[in-house]
Amino acid sequence: MKPDAHLVKQFLLNLQDTICQQLTAVDGAEFVEDSWQREAGGGGRSRVLRNGGVFEQAGVNFSHVHGDAMPASATAHRPELAGRSFEAMGVSLVVHPHNPYVPTSHANVRFFIAEKPGAEPVWWFGGGFDLTPFYGFEEDAIHWHRTARDLCLPFGEDVYPRYKKWCDEYFYLKHRNEQRGIGGLFFDDLNTPDFDHCFAFMQAVGKGYTNAYLPIVERRKTMAYGERERNFQLYRRGRYVEFNLVWDRGTLFGLQTGGRTESILMSMPPLVRWEYDYQPKDGSPEAALNEFIKVRDWV
């Protein structure tokens, strides 16, 4: 089957609806929708839930942008895209819970196609999901990674190990020599063996996110916590901000293509703190996080 951008767009809009419904069912609060248009072509639907029962902030964004020429960030490592019109669409979401024992989560699925007359279209899928705990629970990490592995298995034995490794490498803060969290899946430039296969995999990742995340939320959301845990959560959220502003290609692409800044930066936590030369106490649960987020085989 030829690449069908309309089919992908319909799936993405439905996925946004489904994920918002599932998060609302857990939290009780409703999302507020903000529809926007991009002057250069396209637009999107940003949905944000704030100060809910479980989630301090959850943002689920759909965007579909198109234009006559590619931005520098995209053509730098893909010169074949120069001189082509493009369409980029995706659903991207980040959930920042109140309770420090509930991890932050991020997921994204996207499709890109660039065309010019008389040439075959250049297209690919990308996406994944990753988990950023503040306090490590082995059973949560195992569930997260088993869910990721199980959704990958129908597409091949090598898919989960490959995309887990890519995720570990991508969500890494070089300037801190730290992983952002415990990873999950990350894939990009997926266009083989054919459109149908790649689209099916992207759908599996999009649908798999809540299966991986919501059982962890349910397990941890009522755990008692105090000021110490909250302070540590806010401190560790700083790493999230550092990664998104310094290393994340998606953030850079969005800002360079004249995307909607409010939507692009919706992934930012609502409250964060930095502390100069912070060192957790030896033997404390906070100190244990550094070991917990080191790359390992969870399944």
Swiss-Prot record:
Q: What class of enzyme is it?
A: oxidoreductase
Coiled-coil boundaries = none
Site entry (Important for dimerization), positions: H175
Q: Which residues bind substrate?
A: S92, N108, V109, R110, G258, G259, R260
Question: What keywords does the record list, in alphabetical order?
Answer: Cytoplasm, Heme biosynthesis, Manganese, Metal-binding, Oxidoreductase, Porphyrin biosynthesis
User: Record's PROSITE patterns?
Assistant: COPROGEN_OXIDASE
Pathway entry: Porphyrin-containing compound metabolism; protoporphyrin-IX biosynthesis; protoporphyrinogen-IX from coproporphyrinogen-III (O2 route): step 1/1
Annotated GO biological processes are: protoporphyrinogen IX biosynthetic process
Q: Which residues cross the membrane?
A: none
Major localization class: cytoplasm
Which EC number(s) does UniProt give? 1.3.3.3
Q: What catalytic activity does the UniProt entry give for this protein?
A: coproporphyrinogen III + O2 + 2 H(+) = protoporphyrinogen IX + 2 CO2 + 2 H2O
Q: Which GO terms describe its molecular function?
A: coproporphyrinogen oxidase activity; manganese ion binding; protein homodimerization activity
Q: Where in the cell is it found?
A: Cytoplasm
Q: Which cofactor does it need?
A: Mn(2+)
PANTHER family with a match to the protein in the record:
COPROPORPHYRINOGEN III OXIDASE, MITOCHONDRIAL, OXYGEN-DEPENDENT COPROPORPHYRINOGEN-III OXIDASE, MITOCHONDRIAL
| NCBIfam families cross-referenced by the UniProt entry | PRK05330.1
- Quaternary state and partners of this protein? Homodimer.
Name of the protein in question? Oxygen-dependent coproporphyrinogen-III oxidase
- The source organism is Escherichia coli O7:K1 (strain IAI39 / ExPEC)
